[in-house]
Amino acid sequence: MLYFKVNEGQLGAFKALCERFVAQTRKEPGCVHYAFSFDGDAVHCREGYDNAAALLAHLDNVGPILQEALKIAAITRLEVHAPAAELAELREPLAGLKPAFFAVEGGFRR
Protein backbone atom coordinates (compact mmCIF):
# COMPACT_ATOMS: atom_id res chain seq x y z
CA MET A 1 0.00 0.00 0.00
CA LEU A 2 1.37 3.31 -1.09
CA TYR A 3 0.33 6.76 0.12
CA PHE A 4 1.09 10.08 -1.57
CA LYS A 5 0.57 13.74 -0.71
CA VAL A 6 0.07 15.72 -3.91
CA ASN A 7 1.58 19.19 -4.17
CA GLU A 8 -0.84 22.11 -4.16
CA GLY A 9 -2.42 22.71 -7.56
CA GLN A 10 -1.18 19.40 -8.99
CA LEU A 11 -4.10 17.06 -8.29
CA GLY A 12 -5.36 17.07 -11.89
CA ALA A 13 -1.91 16.25 -13.21
CA PHE A 14 -1.49 13.53 -10.60
CA LYS A 15 -4.84 11.95 -11.51
CA ALA A 16 -3.72 11.86 -15.15
CA LEU A 17 -0.59 10.00 -14.04
CA CYS A 18 -2.78 7.58 -12.08
CA GLU A 19 -4.59 6.72 -15.31
CA ARG A 20 -1.20 5.95 -16.87
CA PHE A 21 -0.19 3.85 -13.85
CA VAL A 22 -3.39 1.81 -14.19
CA ALA A 23 -3.03 1.32 -17.95
CA GLN A 24 0.59 0.21 -17.58
CA THR A 25 -0.11 -2.05 -14.59
CA ARG A 26 -3.10 -3.72 -16.28
CA LYS A 27 -0.57 -5.48 -18.55
CA GLU A 28 1.15 -7.22 -15.61
CA PRO A 29 0.05 -10.85 -15.16
CA GLY A 30 1.29 -10.91 -11.54
CA CYS A 31 -0.87 -7.99 -10.37
CA VAL A 32 -4.11 -9.17 -8.75
CA HIS A 33 -5.59 -5.76 -7.87
CA TYR A 34 -4.65 -2.13 -8.38
CA ALA A 35 -6.60 1.06 -7.67
CA PHE A 36 -6.21 4.65 -6.50
CA SER A 37 -8.38 6.35 -3.86
CA PHE A 38 -8.45 10.08 -3.15
CA ASP A 39 -9.14 12.27 -0.11
CA GLY A 40 -8.27 15.79 -1.17
CA ASP A 41 -4.53 15.85 -1.79
CA ALA A 42 -4.00 12.50 -0.05
CA VAL A 43 -3.85 9.53 -2.42
CA HIS A 44 -3.79 5.83 -1.62
CA CYS A 45 -2.68 3.20 -4.11
CA ARG A 46 -4.06 -0.20 -3.10
CA GLU A 47 -2.21 -2.93 -4.92
CA GLY A 48 -1.59 -6.65 -4.63
CA TYR A 49 0.76 -9.06 -6.38
CA ASP A 50 1.16 -12.82 -6.68
CA ASN A 51 4.63 -12.73 -5.13
CA ALA A 52 7.79 -10.68 -4.59
CA ALA A 53 8.93 -11.17 -8.18
CA ALA A 54 5.65 -9.71 -9.46
CA LEU A 55 6.03 -6.64 -7.22
CA LEU A 56 9.59 -6.06 -8.42
CA ALA A 57 8.47 -6.47 -12.04
CA HIS A 58 5.77 -3.87 -11.38
CA LEU A 59 8.31 -1.36 -10.10
CA ASP A 60 10.40 -1.85 -13.23
CA ASN A 61 7.28 -1.48 -15.38
CA VAL A 62 6.05 1.77 -13.82
CA GLY A 63 9.40 3.28 -12.83
CA PRO A 64 9.32 6.13 -15.37
CA ILE A 65 5.76 7.09 -14.38
CA LEU A 66 6.68 6.97 -10.70
CA GLN A 67 9.56 9.36 -11.34
CA GLU A 68 7.11 11.79 -12.98
CA ALA A 69 4.71 11.43 -10.05
CA LEU A 70 7.45 12.20 -7.53
CA LYS A 71 7.96 15.59 -9.18
CA ILE A 72 4.44 16.65 -8.10
CA ALA A 73 3.81 14.47 -5.04
CA ALA A 74 5.65 12.89 -2.13
CA ILE A 75 5.39 9.35 -0.83
CA THR A 76 4.17 9.66 2.75
CA ARG A 77 4.02 5.94 3.55
CA LEU A 78 4.75 2.64 1.85
CA GLU A 79 3.60 -0.61 3.43
CA VAL A 80 4.50 -4.05 2.13
CA HIS A 81 2.39 -6.94 3.44
CA ALA A 82 3.55 -10.45 2.53
CA PRO A 83 4.68 -13.76 4.00
CA ALA A 84 8.09 -13.48 5.69
CA ALA A 85 9.84 -15.41 2.90
CA GLU A 86 8.56 -12.92 0.30
CA LEU A 87 9.55 -9.96 2.48
CA ALA A 88 13.09 -11.31 2.64
CA GLU A 89 13.28 -11.00 -1.16
CA LEU A 90 12.00 -7.41 -1.07
CA ARG A 91 13.91 -5.77 1.77
CA GLU A 92 17.07 -4.95 -0.16
CA PRO A 93 15.52 -3.91 -3.51
CA LEU A 94 12.93 -1.68 -1.78
CA ALA A 95 15.24 -0.19 0.87
CA GLY A 96 15.50 3.15 -0.95
CA LEU A 97 11.73 3.63 -0.68
CA LYS A 98 11.88 3.12 3.13
CA PRO A 99 8.83 0.85 3.40
CA ALA A 100 7.27 -0.59 6.53
CA PHE A 101 7.28 -4.39 6.17
CA PHE A 102 4.46 -6.47 7.69
CA ALA A 103 4.69 -10.28 7.79
CA VAL A 104 1.35 -11.90 6.95
CA GLU A 105 0.64 -14.80 9.30
CA GLY A 106 -2.98 -15.67 8.70
CA GLY A 107 -6.06 -15.02 6.63
CA PHE A 108 -7.10 -16.21 3.21
CA ARG A 109 -7.08 -15.14 -0.40
CA ARG A 110 -9.54 -16.06 -3.11
Language model region names:
Residues 1-44, 50-60, 71-110:
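Short S/T/G/P-rich N-terminal loop/turn motif that feeds into the first structured element of a domain
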Residues 63-67:
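A short, acidic, amphipathic alpha-helical segment used as a generic capping/interface helix at domain edges
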